[in-house]
Amino acid sequence: MKKILRFAAVASGLVASLITVAPSASAQALRAQGASLADEVVAVVNNDVITGRELDQRVGLIARRLQQQKAPVPPTDQLRAQVLNQMVLERIQVQRAKDDGIVVDNATVQATLGRLAQANGMQLDQYKARIEAQGVPWDLFVRDARTELMLSKLREKEVDSKITVSDAEVASYIASQRGPNAGSQQDLRLEHIFVKAPANAPQADIDVAQKKAEGLLQQALASGANFERLAKNQSEADDAKKGGDLGFKSPASLPSDVVDAVSKLRPGEVNPTLIRVPDGFEIVRLVERRASQNPAASPKIVQTHVRHILLRVGEGKSESQARQQLIDIRRQIESGGDFEKFARTYSQDGSASQGGDLGWISPGETVPEFERAMNTLQDGQVSNPVRTEYGYHLIQVLGRRDAEGSVQQQMDIARQAIGQRKAEQAYSDWLRELRDSSYVQIKLPVAQ
């Protein structure tokens, strides 16, 4: 039986994170600074400007997001400086996208907003009301969604489409994960402080950067040092606002020099020497280790036995009608109705004759929205209506099992991991080059 085909979907990280928000002390402090700062130019970016009003609006959103995530909100001046630098990078990319003729039409924006609403169990009008009730203007929300889609297309054109992964790299990666020490492979959670110093920079500039990095290293090594705070205040990496936290990484996804350095560290320790990387200097702290969760390090994959009911949209049935019908069906199933009978009667998928049964599905065999919803379900649980490009689905998980991954599946996993690592590094390099080639004048003193 043919499975639901995969397709690439763009999701808006910024707008998706602004769902449940509350007023913050930082936002109130910003308003207290007075309206006189609202139209002040805080940055010149090539032939464009960023105003104080734009900055304060974005800072308010970020502060509320941090509060929602129960993360500490930095002091107002520090947060404004960090957000302004983010906005400068964003504005430069938007300018480049426009120069490249990249546009995002209204239909694409609406489709993305629809997926965000569906992911939160709402229809679009409900989602809009929720966003506005939290103090976020809907037109700003839509504009940010369009911007993120534009920048995603720009990155695909300028960076991701140029990434190649050879069969030799795949073979080497799999060998490193499945070698004699595969059973003891550990993922590493690291924090880092980055000081920019491209290899092609004048030697005098490299010397200045190295001196700065050495000073920061001594601060990081000092007894009682707060590495996270130091990274937030001093790191020149994009993740500075997160305290330089890289999350868990497999050794194969990290530069070999970094892996070698942290192999000698205990959790909580800072590497005592600087690490020279192509575009600067790294100060690294090992936070913790854990058993590897990289699928390529194990021949096992988790398969899911799943069935579904699909109602297509546009065949005499509107979005709201399809969704409401599935809500009604789900209610009957929850009250003791037979999922299989409902699937045979109502489903518009080829699996209807089998009661909606798709059999055992491996990771990556379904469209992302379907797989994400499926992965959140317990055995026997029925999902709320899930929107994909095919229509609306009710999904029920019947069971899960460990299975041997095929050679091709392991190769695909390895290729994806290598490609992601190379793409992230290439994107970081490309952003720095784009920033260096742009005219930027920061007029906000604390951001300098």
Curated annotation (Swiss-Prot):
<keyword id="KW-0574">Periplasm</keyword>
<feature type="signal peptide">
    <location>
        <begin position="1"/>
        <end position="27"/>
    </location>
</feature>
<dbReference type="InterPro" id="IPR027304">
    <property type="entry name" value="Trigger_fact/SurA_dom_sf"/>
</dbReference>
<keyword id="KW-0413">Isomerase</keyword>
<dbReference type="GO" id="GO:0006457">
    <property type="term" value="P:protein folding"/>
</dbReference>
<dbReference type="GO" id="GO:0050821">
    <property type="term" value="P:protein stabilization"/>
</dbReference>
<dbReference type="Pfam" id="PF00639">
    <property type="entry name" value="Rotamase"/>
</dbReference>
<dbReference type="Pfam" id="PF09312">
    <property type="entry name" value="SurA_N"/>
</dbReference>
<keyword id="KW-0677">Repeat</keyword>
<dbReference type="GO" id="GO:0043165">
    <property type="term" value="P:Gram-negative-bacterium-type cell outer membrane assembly"/>
</dbReference>
<dbReference type="InterPro" id="IPR046357">
    <property type="entry name" value="PPIase_dom_sf"/>
</dbReference>
<keyword id="KW-0697">Rotamase</keyword>
<dbReference type="InterPro" id="IPR023034">
    <property type="entry name" value="PPIase_SurA"/>
</dbReference>
<dbReference type="GO" id="GO:0042277">
    <property type="term" value="F:peptide binding"/>
</dbReference>
<feature type="domain" description="PpiC 1">
    <location>
        <begin position="185"/>
        <end position="288"/>
    </location>
</feature>
<dbReference type="Pfam" id="PF13616">
    <property type="entry name" value="Rotamase_3"/>
</dbReference>
<keyword id="KW-0732">Signal</keyword>
<dbReference type="GO" id="GO:0051082">
    <property type="term" value="F:unfolded protein binding"/>
</dbReference>
<dbReference type="GO" id="GO:0030288">
    <property type="term" value="C:outer membrane-bounded periplasmic space"/>
</dbReference>
<dbReference type="InterPro" id="IPR050280">
    <property type="entry name" value="OMP_Chaperone_SurA"/>
</dbReference>
<feature type="domain" description="PpiC 2">
    <location>
        <begin position="301"/>
        <end position="399"/>
    </location>
</feature>
<dbReference type="GO" id="GO:0003755">
    <property type="term" value="F:peptidyl-prolyl cis-trans isomerase activity"/>
</dbReference>
<keyword id="KW-0143">Chaperone</keyword>
<dbReference type="InterPro" id="IPR000297">
    <property type="entry name" value="PPIase_PpiC"/>
</dbReference>
<protein>
    <recommendedName>
        <fullName>Chaperone SurA</fullName>
        <ecNumber>5.2.1.8</ecNumber>
    </recommendedName>
</protein>
<dbReference type="InterPro" id="IPR015391">
    <property type="entry name" value="SurA_N"/>
</dbReference>
<comment type="function">
    <text>Chaperone involved in the correct folding and assembly of outer membrane proteins. Recognizes specific patterns of aromatic residues and the orientation of their side chains, which are found more frequently in integral outer membrane proteins. May act in both early periplasmic and late outer membrane-associated steps of protein maturation.</text>
</comment>
